[in-house]
């Protein structure tokens, strides 16, 4: 097999405290770009921003087909290496100098769990990059989205029919970084990383890096706004949604599931996407914030919840379940009333239904971790802590374990998807019932956004408190953890509380544009 050429360049570039303005300057209207940001949970102070300025390859999956689309000459040099790497596991459907389409065999649902995990699968469309560039002096970076519906390729879907809702989203969509801007807000430093996959492109890429550095001297802090409606529609009104909850409670009563998370989708116009993301960050700073700008959609959000995190150095795998919520305590003027806020938190902590729901999901996270981790390494590191956000507060826990040596982060994600806080338990039956009753794909909602590096490190957040924008319309989906004694209206209201932060940011931005 041909060796994988890799040369990396780094340079310090001017620091700017507003990554959204940097993104507007470097990537405005440019597809296949993304911004991933992190903030400290309690203080909400920005920690780090990762801005994928230029992508070499877009990797997208739908069903068992994976497409590798070279976006640059640099990326095109990698396609033959990918084909060679995957040759034994795929059938090649089409091949050009700029694009490679391959198809994997479907998962064998009759195989045992470990055999399923270790078998060739669509996850190898991403794994091939970590294997090709394992020796890279600077870890090669893949950033993007795992959709919720990726799981449908790995669980039995017999007799489940999904309606076409007019929204299109790949099962996964990742970008191989050609130029990555790494911003450290604590040190107030910025570094531009360039990844060269063919020696013929070294000079061109170094020149591109210089051009990016110059643009960083002229950041545009303000965005033009377009007028838009503030009317919100919902795919399931309260009555229809409560009927779904009532029918799902029958399945809980019969013992099919212990708990389940139905959801519904709110929609409204959103022509000012980046300005709305900035407004959301300002209103609701969160541990994980993201903005993905694809040719076919834009996805942005401020998620409080990690999906799966893995450190290759320690082989520690981590799940951060969030379950149990209350609205924040606002006074009549819309300001936080500390006394009311504290009372609501105490009510949340003492609520037996919320405790039961949370502990059930901690147990599910323990089961997920145990499936892929070494014996006796799984433990609950934090239990039922309180996290506060702009409009809602949550109970959170942290479950960790040491990944088995024959597995990697993608094996772990395959075993754990989708996260229990968006599905519930038993997980496979819950996901089947969700499809049966919602009757539509969830697309990005309940999936994961994050990155994978060639050194094996992996960090993702659950796609909640997010907006999926396509054809000028944004879709904000939110769910509720339903148990046997759940109140129907309370569950419907919970979806509204969870969607409020994103909807408010969209409405605020549209109102500014309409002035």
Question: How would you name each of these model-derived features?
Answer:
Residues 1-515:
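Extended alpha-helical targeting/anchoring segments
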């Amino acid at each position: 097999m041909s060796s994988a050429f890799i040369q990396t360049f780094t340079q310090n570039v001017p620091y700017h405290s507003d990554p959204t303005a940097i993104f507007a300057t470097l990537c405005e209207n440019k597809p296949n770009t993304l911004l991933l940001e992190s903030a400290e949970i309690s203080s909400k102070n920005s920690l780090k921003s990762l801005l994928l300025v230029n992508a070499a390859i877009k990797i997208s999956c739908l069903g068992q087909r994976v497409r590798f689309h070279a976006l640059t000459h640099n990326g095109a040099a990698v396609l033959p290496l990918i084909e060679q790497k995957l040759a034994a596991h795929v059938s090649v459907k089409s091949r050009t100098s700029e694009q490679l389409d391959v198809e994997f065999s479907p998962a064998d649902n009759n195989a045992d769990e470990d055999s399923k995990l270790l078998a060739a699968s669509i996850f190898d469309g991403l794994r091939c990059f970590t294997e090709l560039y394992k020796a890279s002096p600077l870890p090669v970076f893949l950033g993007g989205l795992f959709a919720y519906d990726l799981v449908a390729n790995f669980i039995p879907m017999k007799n489940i029919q999904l309606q076409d809702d007019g929204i299109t989203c790949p099962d996964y969509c990742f970008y191989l970084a050609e130029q990555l801007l790494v911003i450290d807000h604590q040190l107030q430093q910025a570094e531009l990383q360039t990844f060269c996959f063919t020696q013929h492109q070294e000079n061109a890429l170094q020149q591109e890096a210089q051009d990016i550095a110059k643009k960083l001297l002229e950041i545009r802090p303000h965005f033009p706004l377009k007028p838009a409606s503030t009317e919100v529609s919902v795919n399931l009104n309260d009555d229809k949604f409560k009927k779904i909850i009532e029918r799902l409670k029958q399945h809980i009563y019969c013992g099919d599931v212990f708990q389940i998370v139905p959801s519904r989708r709110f929609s409204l116009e959103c022509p000012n996407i980046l300005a709305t993301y900035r407004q959301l960050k300002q209103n609701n700073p969160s541990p994980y914030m993201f903005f993905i700008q694809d040719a076919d959609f834009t996805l942005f959000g401020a998620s409080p919840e990690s999906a799966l995190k893995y450190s290759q150095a320690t082989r520690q795998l981590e799940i951060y379940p969030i379950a149990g919520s209350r609205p924040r305590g606002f006074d009549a003027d819309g300001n936080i009333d500390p006394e009311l806020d504290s009372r609501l938190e105490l009510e949340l902590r003492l609520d037996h239904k919320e405790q039961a729901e949370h502990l059930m999901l901690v147990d599910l996270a323990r089961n997920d971790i145990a499936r892929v981790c070494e014996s006796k390494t799984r433990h609950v590191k934090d239990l039922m802590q309180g996290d506060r956000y702009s409009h809602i507060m949550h109970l959170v826990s942290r479950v960790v374990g040491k990944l088995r040596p024959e597995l990697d982060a993608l094996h772990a994600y395959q075993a754990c998807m989708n996260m229990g806080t968006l599905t519930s338990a038993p997980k496979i039956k819950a996901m089947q019932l969700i499809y049966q009753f919602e009757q539509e794909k969830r697309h990005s909602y309940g999936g994961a956004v994050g990155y994978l590096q060639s050194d094996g490190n992996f960090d993702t957040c659950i796609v909640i408190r997010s907006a999926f924008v396509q054809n000028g319309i944004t879709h904000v989906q939110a769910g509720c953890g339903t148990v046997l004694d759940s109140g129907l209206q309370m569950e419907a209201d919970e979806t509204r509380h969870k969607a409020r932060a994103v909807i408010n940011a969209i409405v605020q931005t549209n109102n500014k544009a309409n002035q």
